[in-house]
Amino acid sequence: MPFTGQDTLKTRRTLTVGDKEYDYFSIEVAEEAGLGDVSRLPFSLKVLLENLLRYEDGGSVTVDDAKALAAWLNTGSSSNEIAFRPARVLMQDFTGVPSVVDLAAMRQAMADMGGDPEKINPLNTCNLVIDHSVTAEFTGTADAMQKNIEKEFASNMERYTFLKWGQTAFSNFTVVPPGAGICHQVNLEFLAKTVWTEEEDGKTIAMPDTIVGTDSHTTMVNALSVLGWGVGGIEAEAVMLGQPVTMLIPEVIGFKLTGKMQEGILATDLVLRVVQMLRNKGVVGKFVEFFGPGLEQLSLPDQATLANMAPEYGATCGFFPIDAGTIKYLELTARSQETIQLVEAYAKAQGLWRDADTPDPQFTDTI
């Protein structure tokens, strides 16, 4: 699957990080090419703009799509549809099994027609985390966890055997086994990279990490500046097979955070208040993006609590920009130094980095 288009606006540039070179599609160059002052876009829309610049092929994505997104600045809204291609798909075992069954059926059909069944593979990276089969039949003893895992394997042996076959049979498809944690936790702590890379024609392409998942709380990873949300199983399969998510360019509500939480106040207290405010505002079908000096006082796990609750306040996602806290969390969770250095360098090159001196973006409305 191609990860780049025809680049009509000539925005492709090279970024050197350490001793490695990455190609990327520059938002700054797009601005110089006549798109307008896109540096004022919300960070979440900059991620969508980069996606359009990278996949612009004159067909499913055109220069007019990028211009329409840039024109969003005029009114803070748009009636234009765009084709968004996420970098990854996240599944859990209940919603993911039917997708693997469909892929297996496609392979069987290919074999029946005399073709090579091994040509049937996900085109985008797909991670399936087995976490929805957890039961707690044993409690209160030192070996309770081990007994529960053994019971889980015994009860779900056919499904787990099938999924293990899927991991060995398909490329771009990995399964995280039972007992590793909840899919959103695994995604945040292990799978997400903030800046994704793919190899194409001997070049390494750097891009924002983006995702759709088959669980509504996929939004949790927006705390790590990974733009994403939950979709249905059919949409997820389509993305696995290289198809875009068609969406209206969303309105973006800015939620300004100031000050810091007092001692004894927890992230759950904060999120309940935020949910109340956003429900009163009405943010269904919209992006929420958090900004303001208060971001520096929130740890990334606390930000993840706010991002996780996007389905409760009705927004498509609750996005946090890349900042020093993002880098600190990537270090805390033992991401590679190569990844951490790339995230900081790429974010600064693309205008996706936020610090105390960064001007506030232009939003549809603010709270």
Can you name each region flagged by the protein language model?
Residues 1-367:
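Fe-S-dependent hydro-lyases/dehydratases of central metabolism
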